[in-house]
Curated annotation (Swiss-Prot):
Recorded name of the encoding gene: ung
Similarity comment: Belongs to the uracil-DNA glycosylase (UDG) superfamily. UNG family.
EC number, as in UniProt: 3.2.2.27
Location of the protein in the cell: Cytoplasm
Protein name (record): Uracil-DNA glycosylase
Domain of life: Bacteria
Length: 237
């Protein structure tokens, strides 16, 4: 793809890891992305507080390059409370109380693999091992859940999933809840493993279908079957 000087300049301003930037070039230059940039600029002009901080918006992709992805855990949008969101789905910054969904994830991990329940909720260690912790929508206004839906992020993260679906094989996609499962309908089940369960939020998990889903052991079993190093799910203290 031959880029004009203007297109190259536009791409240079995107703070995105190079392997992802190359694979997503056509989307990053699309009207969807232009519209999304305009929306975020207007939000900042209106002095709205946006989470996560701008340098962390692409954290999931920047920490886990395209060729390193082994697992995708798909979330919906970032936490909307102060100092929570760090650009990784379900993850929070150290020193912040564990959100209920993450507590339930840790409980299931302990039941499934005997991994001690972590005192912090920073999942960076998972991301560094190849777990792409991808929200469908990458920003949110403080205190306003779903406020940045339908502004272009969904199309961007669809493009991320399409790149993984087409360019890679033997990735485990973990889809908790109906929202993630709808988004995951585009995944080729012959090339990849798709694991589904209820959402870990207390409302959904307590109705059944999350606890006992054993996605962590199933993930590692599949990776090992395909000669891929399994994930060490235990977080540092």
């Amino acid at each position: 793809m031959q880029l004009t000087e203007q297109q190259q300049d536009k791409l240079s301003k995107v703070q995105l890891e190079e392997s992802w930037k190359r694979s997503l070039t056509s989307f990053l230059l699309s009207p969807y992305m232009d519209s999304l940039r305009d929306f975020l600029f207007q939000q900042k002009q209106a002095q709205k507080t946006i989470y996560p901080p701008s340098k962390q918006i692409f954290n999931a992709l920047n920490i886990t390059p395209l060729d390193h992805v082994k697992v995708v855990i798909l979330g919906q949008d970032p936490y909307h409370g102060p100092n929570q969101a760090n650009g990784l789905s379900f993850s929070v910054q150290r020193g912040v109380a564990l959100p209920p969904s993450l507590r339930n994830i840790f409980h299931e991990l302990h039941t499934d693999l005997g991994v001690p329940v972590s005192r912090h909720g920073d999942l960076t260690k998972w991301a560094e091992q190849g777990v792409l912790l991808l929200n469908s929508v990458l920003t949110v206004e403080a205190g306003q859940p779903t406020s940045h839906h339908k502004q272009g992020w969904e199309e961007f993260t669809d493009a991320v999933i399409d790149v993984l679906n087409e360019q890679r094989e033997h990735i485990v996609f973990i889809l908790w809840g109906a929202y993630a499962q709808r988004k995951g309908q585009r995944i080729n089940r012959e090339k990849h493993l798709v694991l589904t369960a209820a959402h870990p939020s207390p409302l959904a998990a307590n109705r059944g279908g999350f606890f006992g889903c054993k996605v962590f052991s199933k993930t590692n079993q599949y990776l090992k079957q395909h000669g891929i190093e399994p994930i060490d799910w235990q977080l540092d203290a």
